[in-house]
Amino acid sequence: MRCRTCGPDLSSQWFEDAVESKYNRTPEQKILQIRKGNTAFMEQFDPYLDTVEKIYWAGGEPLIMDEHWYIMNKLVELGKGRTSPLRIFYNTNFSKLTYKEHDAIELWKNFNDLSIGASLDASGKKAEYLRKGTKWSETLENRWRLKNEIPHHDFNISCTVSMFNVLDVCNFYREMCDIGFIEPKDFGVNILLGKHIHRATVLPKHMREEAQRQI
């Protein structure tokens, strides 16, 4: 998907727009996959998987990366999820829980200590605007399925605060708590710094003061 607060260095969907607009951080080509089709690259990790204690998955989007599924399925084969103190952390846009023949929730059932951080900046139509490609109804369906099937896993929202949503963050937080999407403690914020034209600091003074008043 194309989130409005990132760019082609973090999302392949941004590449064509970045080339057309002459964005100054555009890679020479789309960043799609490390050594695509080269399974020998992933097999280098096999001897070390039995000793892994912590994994942090981020992206891009880890749930549509072949490398993610290769390693996680190997860990299941080794029995690491149930019999060891392995801790697993995700940052995901939480838009799609299936990939090819894989199902994330079925995978996660094999692990005891797993934390899912959903990168969500708003709800409804605004969520679909900020992270183009989002279908909010599907995000809700994914959350209810997760709560029903593996309620013991940690789930939290990681919200990027920018000029687009700084005046709505508090309402978004309350809404997510009110509908049971998260517990009150499960909400974190990232202040957008990398894309200066979209920082909250570009807003007029009266809007910045209103944001401060709300917080």
Where are the regions that the model predicts?
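Core AdoMet radical
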Residues: G7-T39, L49-D66, L78-K100, W108-E141, ...
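Short, well-ordered alpha-helices that flank and scaffold nucleotide-derived cofactor binding pockets
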Residues: P8, N73, E77, D178
